[in-house]
Protein backbone atom coordinates (compact mmCIF):
# COMPACT_ATOMS: atom_id res chain seq x y z
CA UNK A 1 0.00 0.00 0.00
CA UNK A 2 1.42 3.32 -1.00
CA UNK A 3 1.66 6.32 1.31
CA UNK A 4 -1.20 7.94 -0.64
CA UNK A 5 -3.43 4.90 -0.10
CA UNK A 6 -2.57 4.78 3.60
CA UNK A 7 -3.45 8.48 3.90
CA UNK A 8 -6.79 7.97 2.20
CA UNK A 9 -7.53 5.01 4.48
CA UNK A 10 -6.65 7.04 7.60
CA UNK A 11 -8.88 9.90 6.50
CA UNK A 12 -11.72 7.43 5.85
CA UNK A 13 -11.31 5.96 9.34
CA UNK A 14 -11.33 9.44 10.90
CA UNK A 15 -14.45 10.41 8.95
CA UNK A 16 -16.25 7.23 10.00
CA UNK A 17 -15.21 7.78 13.63
CA UNK A 18 -16.46 11.37 13.53
CA UNK A 19 -19.75 10.27 11.97
CA UNK A 20 -20.25 7.57 14.60
CA UNK A 21 -19.43 10.10 17.33
CA UNK A 22 -22.04 12.51 15.95
CA UNK A 23 -24.66 9.78 15.75
CA UNK A 24 -23.96 8.61 19.31
CA UNK A 25 -23.98 12.20 20.61
CA UNK A 26 -27.31 12.83 18.89
CA UNK A 27 -28.76 9.64 20.36
CA UNK A 28 -27.59 10.61 23.86
CA UNK A 29 -29.00 14.14 23.47
CA UNK A 30 -32.35 12.75 22.33
CA UNK A 31 -32.36 10.35 25.25
CA UNK A 32 -31.70 13.20 27.69
CA UNK A 33 -34.52 15.23 26.14
CA UNK A 34 -36.86 12.25 26.37
CA UNK A 35 -35.95 11.77 30.03
CA UNK A 36 -36.51 15.47 30.76
CA UNK A 37 -39.81 15.42 28.85
CA UNK A 38 -40.94 12.31 30.72
CA UNK A 39 -39.96 13.87 34.05
CA UNK A 40 -41.84 17.10 33.22
CA UNK A 41 -44.91 15.16 32.10
CA UNK A 42 -44.83 13.10 35.29
CA UNK A 43 -44.50 16.28 37.37
CA UNK A 44 -47.44 17.89 35.55
CA UNK A 45 -49.59 14.84 36.20
CA UNK A 46 -48.65 14.89 39.89
CA UNK A 47 -49.39 18.62 40.11
CA UNK A 48 -52.80 18.09 38.51
CA UNK A 49 -53.69 15.27 40.90
CA UNK A 50 -52.58 17.37 43.88
CA UNK A 51 -54.70 20.28 42.64
CA UNK A 52 -57.74 18.00 42.32
CA UNK A 53 -57.12 16.79 45.89
CA UNK A 54 -57.18 20.42 47.03
CA UNK A 55 -60.38 21.01 45.07
CA UNK A 56 -61.98 18.01 46.80
CA UNK A 57 -61.00 19.48 50.18
CA UNK A 58 -62.61 22.81 49.24
CA UNK A 59 -65.81 21.02 48.21
CA UNK A 60 -65.87 19.24 51.55
CA UNK A 61 -65.79 22.56 53.42
CA UNK A 62 -68.83 23.76 51.48
CA UNK A 63 -70.59 20.41 51.92
CA UNK A 64 -70.02 20.58 55.67
CA UNK A 65 -71.56 24.06 55.78
CA UNK A 66 -74.48 22.89 53.62
CA UNK A 67 -75.20 20.08 56.08
CA UNK A 68 -75.27 22.32 59.13
CA UNK A 69 -78.64 23.08 60.67
CA UNK A 70 -79.02 26.40 58.83
CA UNK A 71 -77.16 25.22 55.74
CA UNK A 72 -76.05 28.04 53.47
CA UNK A 73 -79.35 29.93 53.56
CA UNK A 74 -77.15 32.59 55.13
CA UNK A 75 -73.54 32.81 53.93
CA UNK A 76 -71.10 34.64 56.21
CA UNK A 77 -67.44 34.83 57.16
CA UNK A 78 -67.82 32.69 60.28
CA UNK A 79 -68.38 29.49 58.30
CA UNK A 80 -65.87 26.74 57.44
CA UNK A 81 -65.39 27.84 53.84
CA UNK A 82 -64.23 31.30 55.05
CA UNK A 83 -61.42 30.16 57.37
CA UNK A 84 -58.82 31.80 55.14
CA UNK A 85 -56.02 30.37 52.97
CA UNK A 86 -54.91 26.90 54.05
CA UNK A 87 -51.58 25.22 53.27
CA UNK A 88 -50.91 21.48 53.33
CA UNK A 89 -47.94 19.23 52.62
CA UNK A 90 -49.00 16.10 50.77
CA UNK A 91 -47.19 13.44 48.72
CA UNK A 92 -43.99 15.45 48.62
CA UNK A 93 -45.76 18.57 47.37
CA UNK A 94 -47.45 21.61 48.87
CA UNK A 95 -50.97 22.92 48.32
CA UNK A 96 -52.39 26.34 49.18
CA UNK A 97 -56.19 26.58 49.03
CA UNK A 98 -58.23 29.78 49.09
CA UNK A 99 -62.03 29.78 48.96
CA UNK A 100 -63.92 32.91 47.98
CA UNK A 101 -67.60 33.83 47.88
CA UNK A 102 -68.28 35.19 44.39
CA UNK A 103 -71.38 36.85 45.84
CA UNK A 104 -69.02 39.37 47.45
CA UNK A 105 -68.22 40.69 43.96
CA UNK A 106 -70.28 42.90 41.68
CA UNK A 107 -72.43 40.72 39.41
CA UNK A 108 -71.84 41.78 35.81
CA UNK A 109 -74.88 39.84 34.62
CA UNK A 110 -77.09 42.49 36.20
CA UNK A 111 -75.84 44.93 33.56
CA UNK A 112 -76.58 42.72 30.57
CA UNK A 113 -79.83 44.26 29.31
CA UNK A 114 -78.91 47.87 30.09
CA UNK A 115 -82.20 48.67 31.86
CA UNK A 116 -81.18 47.96 35.46
CA UNK A 117 -80.59 51.52 36.67
CA UNK A 118 -79.69 50.57 40.26
CA UNK A 119 -77.00 48.09 39.23
CA UNK A 120 -75.70 50.46 36.54
CA UNK A 121 -75.31 53.30 39.06
CA UNK A 122 -73.61 51.00 41.59
CA UNK A 123 -71.17 49.78 38.96
CA UNK A 124 -70.22 53.33 38.00
CA UNK A 125 -69.65 54.22 41.66
CA UNK A 126 -67.47 51.11 42.06
CA UNK A 127 -65.40 52.16 39.04
CA UNK A 128 -64.91 55.61 40.57
CA UNK A 129 -63.82 54.08 43.89
CA UNK A 130 -61.27 51.94 42.04
CA UNK A 131 -59.99 54.89 40.02
CA UNK A 132 -61.15 53.42 36.70
CA UNK A 133 -62.68 55.15 33.69
CA UNK A 134 -66.48 54.88 33.37
CA UNK A 135 -67.76 52.35 30.85
CA UNK A 136 -70.90 50.31 30.22
CA UNK A 137 -70.65 46.50 29.81
CA UNK A 138 -74.23 46.53 28.47
CA UNK A 139 -72.82 47.94 25.23
CA UNK A 140 -71.05 44.66 24.51
CA UNK A 141 -72.86 42.55 21.93
CA UNK A 142 -74.32 39.34 23.35
CA UNK A 143 -75.81 36.19 21.83
CA UNK A 144 -79.53 35.74 22.48
CA UNK A 145 -81.10 32.80 24.25
CA UNK A 146 -84.23 30.95 23.19
CA UNK A 147 -86.33 33.51 25.06
CA UNK A 148 -84.82 36.30 22.97
CA UNK A 149 -82.95 37.78 25.94
CA UNK A 150 -79.17 38.30 26.05
CA UNK A 151 -77.28 35.34 27.48
CA UNK A 152 -75.29 35.90 30.70
CA UNK A 153 -71.62 36.80 30.55
CA UNK A 154 -69.47 33.70 30.17
CA UNK A 155 -66.78 35.30 32.30
CA UNK A 156 -65.51 38.68 33.43
CA UNK A 157 -62.82 38.38 30.75
CA UNK A 158 -65.43 39.56 28.21
CA UNK A 159 -64.72 43.08 29.47
CA UNK A 160 -61.47 42.93 27.50
CA UNK A 161 -63.59 43.98 24.51
CA UNK A 162 -64.24 47.39 26.04
CA UNK A 163 -61.99 50.15 24.70
CA UNK A 164 -62.06 51.92 28.09
CA UNK A 165 -60.19 49.05 29.77
CA UNK A 166 -56.51 48.48 29.11
CA UNK A 167 -54.45 45.66 30.65
CA UNK A 168 -53.73 47.62 33.84
CA UNK A 169 -57.39 48.57 34.22
CA UNK A 170 -58.50 44.99 33.73
CA UNK A 171 -56.06 43.76 36.37
CA UNK A 172 -57.43 46.38 38.75
CA UNK A 173 -61.07 45.55 38.08
CA UNK A 174 -60.92 41.75 37.78
CA UNK A 175 -60.92 40.91 41.54
CA UNK A 176 -64.05 43.00 42.10
CA UNK A 177 -66.41 41.56 39.49
CA UNK A 178 -67.85 38.19 38.50
CA UNK A 179 -70.60 36.74 36.33
CA UNK A 180 -73.02 34.99 38.69
CA UNK A 181 -76.30 34.91 36.70
CA UNK A 182 -79.02 36.34 38.96
CA UNK A 183 -76.97 36.38 42.18
CA UNK A 184 -77.17 39.42 44.44
CA UNK A 185 -74.40 41.19 46.37
CA UNK A 186 -73.92 39.28 49.62
CA UNK A 187 -73.98 41.87 52.41
CA UNK A 188 -72.39 39.36 54.81
CA UNK A 189 -69.18 38.96 52.80
CA UNK A 190 -68.90 42.08 50.62
CA UNK A 191 -65.84 44.27 51.32
CA UNK A 192 -66.12 47.97 52.11
CA UNK A 193 -65.55 49.02 48.49
CA UNK A 194 -68.62 47.09 47.34
CA UNK A 195 -70.77 48.47 50.17
CA UNK A 196 -69.57 52.01 49.38
CA UNK A 197 -71.03 51.64 45.89
CA UNK A 198 -74.56 51.42 47.36
CA UNK A 199 -76.91 54.40 47.34
CA UNK A 200 -75.98 57.20 49.75
CA UNK A 201 -72.92 55.47 51.22
CA UNK A 202 -69.23 56.37 51.23
CA UNK A 203 -66.05 54.56 52.27
CA UNK A 204 -66.23 55.83 55.84
CA UNK A 205 -69.74 54.45 56.39
CA UNK A 206 -68.89 51.28 54.45
CA UNK A 207 -65.86 50.55 56.64
CA UNK A 208 -67.98 51.11 59.74
CA UNK A 209 -70.58 48.68 58.36
CA UNK A 210 -67.90 46.01 57.85
CA UNK A 211 -66.66 46.50 61.42
CA UNK A 212 -70.21 46.30 62.81
CA UNK A 213 -71.19 43.24 60.78
CA UNK A 214 -72.39 40.39 63.05
CA UNK A 215 -70.05 37.40 63.29
CA UNK A 216 -72.78 35.15 61.89
CA UNK A 217 -73.93 37.72 59.34
CA UNK A 218 -77.21 39.51 58.85
CA UNK A 219 -80.28 37.28 58.89
CA UNK A 220 -81.91 39.25 56.07
CA UNK A 221 -81.41 42.25 53.80
CA UNK A 222 -84.01 44.07 55.90
CA UNK A 223 -81.89 43.52 59.03
CA UNK A 224 -78.98 45.20 57.25
CA UNK A 225 -81.13 48.13 56.09
CA UNK A 226 -82.55 48.72 59.60
CA UNK A 227 -79.24 48.94 61.47
CA UNK A 228 -78.52 52.28 63.23
CA UNK A 229 -75.55 53.11 60.99
CA UNK A 230 -77.95 53.47 58.06
CA UNK A 231 -80.47 55.66 59.86
CA UNK A 232 -81.58 58.44 57.52
CA UNK A 233 -79.99 56.78 54.48
CA UNK A 234 -82.05 55.14 51.76
CA UNK A 235 -80.37 52.02 50.43
CA UNK A 236 -82.42 50.10 47.89
CA UNK A 237 -82.84 46.39 48.67
CA UNK A 238 -82.81 45.53 44.98
CA UNK A 239 -79.87 43.31 43.99
CA UNK A 240 -78.83 42.64 47.59
CA UNK A 241 -78.69 39.33 49.43
CA UNK A 242 -77.38 37.58 52.54
CA UNK A 243 -76.62 34.28 50.79
CA UNK A 244 -74.62 32.94 47.86
CA UNK A 245 -74.52 29.87 45.66
CA UNK A 246 -71.31 30.42 43.73
CA UNK A 247 -67.82 30.12 45.16
CA UNK A 248 -64.31 30.04 43.75
CA UNK A 249 -61.44 27.82 44.90
CA UNK A 250 -57.94 29.00 43.97
CA UNK A 251 -55.48 26.12 44.30
CA UNK A 252 -51.73 26.71 44.15
CA UNK A 253 -49.60 23.57 44.00
CA UNK A 254 -45.80 23.22 44.25
CA UNK A 255 -43.74 20.10 43.58
CA UNK A 256 -40.02 20.79 43.62
CA UNK A 257 -39.43 23.58 41.11
CA UNK A 258 -42.74 22.94 39.33
CA UNK A 259 -45.81 25.13 39.97
CA UNK A 260 -49.48 25.02 38.97
CA UNK A 261 -52.55 27.15 39.74
CA UNK A 262 -56.04 25.74 39.25
CA UNK A 263 -59.10 27.99 39.58
CA UNK A 264 -62.35 26.08 40.14
CA UNK A 265 -65.81 27.67 40.25
CA UNK A 266 -68.25 25.80 42.49
CA UNK A 267 -72.04 25.86 42.81
CA UNK A 268 -73.87 24.86 46.00
CA UNK A 269 -77.16 23.23 44.98
CA UNK A 270 -80.50 22.98 46.73
CA UNK A 271 -80.14 19.17 46.86
CA UNK A 272 -77.14 19.52 49.17
CA UNK A 273 -74.49 18.83 46.53
CA UNK A 274 -71.57 20.96 45.37
CA UNK A 275 -71.11 21.06 41.60
CA UNK A 276 -67.93 21.95 39.71
CA UNK A 277 -69.04 24.60 37.21
CA UNK A 278 -65.70 25.00 35.48
CA UNK A 279 -61.96 24.69 35.88
CA UNK A 280 -59.21 26.78 34.34
CA UNK A 281 -55.45 27.02 34.69
CA UNK A 282 -53.92 30.38 35.58
CA UNK A 283 -50.45 31.81 36.09
CA UNK A 284 -48.95 30.39 39.32
CA UNK A 285 -49.43 32.59 42.36
CA UNK A 286 -47.09 33.91 45.04
CA UNK A 287 -44.40 31.67 46.60
CA UNK A 288 -45.41 29.55 49.55
CA UNK A 289 -44.75 30.87 53.04
CA UNK A 290 -41.77 29.29 54.73
Model-based region annotation:
Residues 2-290:
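Compositionally biased linear targeting/interaction segments
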Amino acid sequence: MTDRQRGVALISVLLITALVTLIVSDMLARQRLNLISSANQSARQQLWQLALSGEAWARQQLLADLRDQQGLARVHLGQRWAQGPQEFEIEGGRIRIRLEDLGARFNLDRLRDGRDRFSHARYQRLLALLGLAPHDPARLSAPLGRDGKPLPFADASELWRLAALDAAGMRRLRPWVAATRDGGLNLNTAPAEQLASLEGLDMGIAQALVQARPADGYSSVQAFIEQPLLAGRKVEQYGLSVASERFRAVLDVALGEHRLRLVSDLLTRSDGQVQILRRRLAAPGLPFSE
